[in-house]
Regions:
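Internal intein/HINT superfamily modules and their associated LAGLIDADG
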Residues: 1-248
Length: 248
């Protein structure tokens, strides 16, 4: 189903004297569709896809929102209506790829999601006409170069499901690592290991969304520099291990 502006552009090309074959090759629109638009330009009401309300699967949405803010983007279909949501996932984490695809299928009203292999990573892709309604943070340019804020209905979902949001952000732009140190005990040097979580993002707004949600669930954090958050206290790492865990 094509929106009215797409239909008008196609018919304008035909009005320039071009053949239906020529316009069809350029736009990907069938000749039959263009012929039908001469009789009726407006789409039938039953064919129109209405903008969605808030997603019903809030758990999956909160996780997918975190993934989108970290490694996701939305782009318009090059020749027709609708948009693609893409989330880049490293090949190293097949479990993350599975979780991303499952969340996208659940959130997408059409249930559509598939994978595109690239060098070193997989793009999980879903097509849907109204992705920008579900992710109003979409806009021109890079996320860290524009303001990022949650809509009230998004904030309500994150407040209800904070750990899923944190997990999505960690899975996209975070990691769990193990540091170590040595000390002398009774004249013998012993090695001690301790895990910690890191989150890195160039957007100060996304950093604040992350740390505000950490505060909400009682996780202590430290800002090492403007784009890095460290979680190292034992109790907080234990909380993160319970609800997030390492990528796999």
């Amino acid at each position: 189903m094509y929106d009215v502006s797409t239909r008008k552009r196609a018919l304008a090309l035909v009005a320039q004297g071009r053949s239906l074959n020529s316009v069809s090759r350029e736009t990907g629109i069938s000749r039959a569709a263009m012929r039908s638009w001469h009789a009726r330009l407006e789409p039938l009401p039953r064919m129109a896809v209405p903008p969605p309300g808030p997603p019903t699967d809030e758990v999956s949405y909160s996780y997918l929102l975190g993934l989108y803010l970290g490694d996701g983007c939305i782009s318009a279909h090059p020749r027709g209506p609708g948009h693609y949501l893409r989330v880049a996932c490293a090949n190293s984490w097949p479990g993350l790829i599975d979780a991303c695809e499952a969340a996208m299928r659940s959130v997408n009203p059409s249930g559509n999601a598939y994978r595109v292999q690239a060098q070193g990573y997989v793009s999980v892709v879903g097509y849907y006409p109204h992705w920008p309604h579900l992710f109003p943070q979409h806009g021109p340019g890079k996320k860290h170069e524009r303001r990022i804020a949650l809509a009230p209905w998004q904030q309500a979902i994150v407040d209800a499901h904070p750990w899923e949001f944190i997990r999505g952000l960690i899975h996209s732009d975070g990691c769990r690592i193990t540091n170590w140190a040595t000390r002398l005990v009774g004249g013998e040097r012993k090695r001690y290991e301790y895990p910690r979580y890191f989150f890195t993002n160039l957007s100060g707004d996304i950093i604040r969304l992350f740390t505000t949600t950490l505060d909400h669930v009682g996780v202590d954090w430290r800002q090492a520099n403007p784009r890095n958050i460290s979680i190292a206290r034992k109790a907080s790492v234990a909380l993160m291990d319970t609800h997030v865990g390492p990528k796999h």
